[in-house]
Amino acid sequence: MPVARPQAAGPDRISLFLVAFLLGSPAAAQAEDGGPEGEMHPSTAYLLPSASLESSLEEGVTSAAPGLLPSQEALEAMEESLPPALPDEASVQHTPALRKGLPSLKQLNSARRQLRPLATPTTLQRLGSPASATTKLREPEDPEQPTAPAPLQIAPFTALATTLPHSPQPAQAPDDSSPGSPLDKGDNELTGSASEESQETTTSTIVTTTIITTEQAPALCGVSFSDPEGYIDSSDFPPQPYSSFLECTYNVTVYTGYGVELQVKSVNLSEGELLSIRGVDGPTLTVLANQTLLVEGQVIRSPTNTISVYFRTFQDDGLGTFQLHYQAFMLSCPFPRRPDAGEVTVMDLHSGGVAHFHCHLGYELQGAKTLTCINASKPHWSSQEPVCSAPCGGAVHNATIGRVLSPSFPGTANGSQLCVWTIEAPEGQKLHLHLERLLLHEKDRMIVYSGRTNTSALLYDSLRTESVPFEGLLSEGSSIRIEFTSDQGQAASAFNIRFEAFEKGHCYEPYIQNGNFTTSDPTYNIGTIVEFTCDPGHSLEQGPAVIECVNVRDPYWNDTEPLCRAMCGGELSAVAGVVLSPNWPEPYAEGEDCVWKIHVGEEKRIFLDIQFLNLSNSDILTIYDGDEVVPHVLGQYFGHSSPQKLYSSTPDLTIQFHSDPAGLIFGKGQGFIMNYIEVSRNDSCSDLPEIQNGWKTTSHTELVRGARITYQCDPGYDIVGSDTLTCQWDLSWSSDPPFCEKIMYCTDPGEVEHSTRLISDPVLLVGTTIQYTCSPGFVLEGSSLLTCYSRETGTPIWTSRLPHCVSEESLACDNPGLPENGYQILYKRLYLPGESLTFMCYEGFELMGEVTIRCILGQPSHWSGPLPICKVNQDSFEHALEAEAAAESSLEGGNMALAIFIPVLLISLLLGGAYIYVTRCRQYSSLRLPLMYSHPYSQITVETEFDNPIYETGETREYEVSI
C-alpha cells in the first residue's frame, strides 16, 4: 500500500545525507540538499553503502522506517527525473536491501581507510582498452610469487536505485562487453547487491555502493647507465603517480674489459622491500648481494662489464631510499690453474697478458703451451689450461737427462696396457738408468733392453728378478728400450726411472735421492771421487759414503750409490735437527715401531715444532718429556692434526711412533715432519731471528715473560703478520715472526676539487693510472695523468704530484696595456693561460720587443715577456728632417720675398689710392694734406683760399711736385 511522502528535512533524509557525506560523495550531499521540496539535480546521486560492502558494514546499515519512506508514485517520479548512474542502466539490476542499522562514524572511517583507492600506472596506461576496462576478482595464481595486497576501491559515483515490488531479481554483474559503457574508458566495473527482506515491504530505499578488488600490476621502471663513474640514487627516479607497487632495474654497462664496482653510500629500506645487486653474464644473473648484506661502505664488484641493481617494493606509505656509487675498474683473467707436475708463469692477468706452461721431467704437456687473456665482457683465457701427463711410451732422441714415469691414464677398456719407451743418446755416448722408484703389481711386468729392439741384450726383467737394481742399469751402446705391460683396469704400478747420457771413457754422473754429493772432477773421469751426504732426517743406507771411478778400459764406479732413507728411530744430539716418519716422503710401512731420543746441552731445553702430521686412526705418535718413556706425556696424536709446538722441561725429549700391523686393512697415513732446536732453559723465551728487509726492537734486555719484540720493515716493504710478539707464560711467543713483503701498490692520492677522475685499478697496484679532468670553467694545474711506478728502494709512488683545478679567472693574465704609438690585435680584458696577445705600431714607428707575448700558467699567471715599445723609425726620421729642412729653406726665401714684396705692395697701394683719390676728387675735395710747418698763407680765410680756382690748382700741382 502507498505510504506518505516524507518531509524535506525528515530524519531519514538527514541520515542519508550524513552517510553520503561520510563516504565522500559531494554529489550525493548536494542532491540531498537540493531544494525545499527535496527535488534532486539531474546530475546528482546518492552514495550509500550496500550490503556487499563488508559484513561489519552490512550489520550497521538499515533502511528507513516504512512510515518515513516516499510513496510509490513519488519514487517513480523521482526515478524518471534522475539520470542513470551508468549509461546502461538496464544491465544493472538491484534487489531490496536488508533492513540494517546505519553505520557509526568510526565504522565508516575504518571502511574508508580499508577501501582507499589505489591506482597504478599500468592501469592508467590501459585507458581506452576494452580488454582492460573491467578488473574482476581473481584467485592468486602462484603463492610463491610476491603479489601486492588487493585493495578495495570505491567507485566515484553511485545512484539512487528503486525496485518495484513486482520485479525482484537477484543481483547480477554487468556484461563485460557492454558497448558504450564508461568502463571501456578505464573505469572500474560497478556491481551492486541487495536482498529482499519481507514481502510486506512494498517499496524501500536501496543503499548501493560498488566494491572492486583490484590486483595491481607493478609500476615498471628501467634506467641504464654507461658513464665510467656516477651514482645510482633511487630518489632521482621516483615512482609514477598513484603507484605503490614498484619494480625498478638499474643497469650499468661500461667498456668491454672493464668491470663495475659499486660502493654503498646509503641504504634505508622499509620492511618487505627488496634490493638485489646482480652480476650479468649473458642471460645468466648471479646475485652478488642483497638487502640483508648491504651496509654503508660495502664494495661489490661485477665479474663482467655489466651490473644490475633490482629494487622492488610494495609499500604505499613511503618508499625506501638508497644511493650507490659506481665506477669502472679493469677486469682481469683469473690466475690459471697450475698443472700437476708442472709450472705456470704469468706475465700479466689483464687483457693481452700471456701465461706460459711447462711440465716437469718425464711429463708431456697436453694442450696449449701459451694462453692469452682475451678482452671480453668477462675476460677469459684463450683456451683451457693444459695438463701434464706421463705418456704411455715414446721416443727420446739425443737424450741427455730425463725421466720415464708410470703412465697417468689406464689402458684400453679391457684393462690391458703396453707402453714402450726408446731412449737414444748422441753417438759415442752411453746411458745410465737409475730406478728411484719401482713398485709393480704382481701381474705387471717391466723389461729393459740394451738397444732399440726387443731382441737386444736384456738388462732387466721384473719377472725374473725379485730385487730392484737400485744401483742402476748401464747400456752397452747408445740406446735403451723399456717395455711396460699391465693387465690392471686401474694402473696399480708406480715407477720413476731417471736416465742420463755420459761420454764413453767416463763414469756416469751419480745420483742420490733425499741427499747430495760432492765430486773432485765434474767430468767424472778416471780417478774421480764422489762423497755423499743425506738431507736432515735421513741416513745413508745400502752403500758407502764415498765412491771412485775406476777401470780405464771401461770406467765404472767401484761401488753403487748409497740410499738416503728416513730413519726409524735413533739418537740425535745436534743443536737442531729433523725427525721424519719412516721412509719419508714415501708412506711409512705397517708394523713400524720407532723411538727417537733427542739430547741437547745440559742448561738447555728442546723446542719441538710439529709441522705436518697425517696418520691413520690406528697409528699413534707419543712425545715424552725426558729421556725415558715415563708418564709425563707432552702430547699424543693420531689421525690428522694441525701444526703443534711443544717445549720440554729438560734437555731430553723422547718420540715414539707405532704403526698398526693391519695398516693394509685400515689404511695408512702419509707420515709426519718435526723440527727441533735447543733453547734456553732459564725463565725467558728463545730469541727470535731477524727478518729480511726489516729489523726488530726488544722491550727488555732479557726475553722474560711479558717481554715484547717489535718488527719493522724497510721503506718500500709492508709487514705481513703480527708486528709485535709477546713472551707468554709458557715461554712461547704469541705468534710466529712476521716477514716483510715488497709494497706493490701506491697510496690513494685523493680527489681533486672541481674535477673527476678515472682509475684503471681501484687496488692501485703498480702500473695503475689515474686520469683527472677538471669541471667546465676550471683549468688543470699540473699533470692530468698519474701513474703508480715501483722503485728499487722505497714504496711505489706516483709519477707526479696531485694536480689542482683552479678557476679560469684566477689564472687569467690581465691586459698589459697599450704601448705608446701602438695598438693591440683582438683586445680583451683577460687572457687565459696559453692565449697570446699581438702588438702593432703606428706608421713611422718601429716595434722594439716581442711582437707576440703569451700568458704563462702560474701563481699568479704572467706574460712571457714585457710590453714592447714603439720607437720612431730612423729612416723615416731622417726623411722627416730633410723635409723639414727643405720646408724651412723654402719658408725663409718666401719670408724674404714677402718682407720685400709686402711693403712695396703697401706703398704701391697707398700711392695708387692717393693718386686715384686726388685725380678723381680734386675738383671738389676740401681736403688738404697737413704740413709740418705753418703755411705762409695761413692768415687767408677759408673762403678766400677755396674760392680762388687758380690758386687751388697751382697749390695742388706744387704739392705734387714737392712730393
UniProtKB/Swiss-Prot annotation:
This is Seizure 6-like protein. Residues 331-390, 505-566, 683-742, 744-807, 811-872 form the Sushi domain. GO terms for cellular component: endoplasmic reticulum; endoplasmic reticulum membrane; glutamatergic synapse; neuronal cell body; postsynaptic membrane. Glycans are attached at N251, N268, N290, N375, N398, N414, N454, N516, N558, N614, N682. Disruption phenotype: Mice lacking Sez6, Sez6l1, Sez6l2 exhibit motor discordination, and PCs are ofen innervated by multiple climbing fibers with different neuronal origins in the cerebellum. Expressed exclusively in the brain, predominantly in neurons. Wide expression in the gray matter of the brain with high levels in the olfactory bulb, anterior olfactory nuclei, hippocampal formation and cerebellar cortex. Detected diffusely and weakly in the white matter, such as the corpus callosum and cerebellar medulla. In the cerebellar cortex, intensely expressed in Purkinje cells and granule cells. Detected also in interneurons in the molecular layer. SUPFAM superfamilies: Complement control module/SCR domain (SSF57535), Spermadhesin, CUB domain (SSF49854). Keywords: Cell membrane, Disulfide bond, Endoplasmic reticulum, Glycoprotein, Membrane, Repeat, Signal, Sushi, Transmembrane, Transmembrane helix. It is a single-pass type I membrane protein. Residues 47-59, 191-204 have a biased composition (Low complexity). SMART domains: CCP, CUB. Belongs to the SEZ6 family. InterPro entries: CUB_dom, SEZ6_CSMD_C4BPB_Regulators, Sperma_CUB_dom_sf, Sushi/SCR/CCP_sf, Sushi_SCR_CCP_dom. It is found in: Cell membrane; Endoplasmic reticulum membrane. Residues 221-329, 392-502, 568-679 form the CUB domain. Residues 919-963 are cytoplasmic. It comes from the Eukaryota. Residues 120-135 have a biased composition (Polar residues). PROSITE patterns: CUB, SUSHI. Residues 32-897 are extracellular. Candidate tumor suppressor gene. May contribute to specialized endoplasmic reticulum functions in neurons.
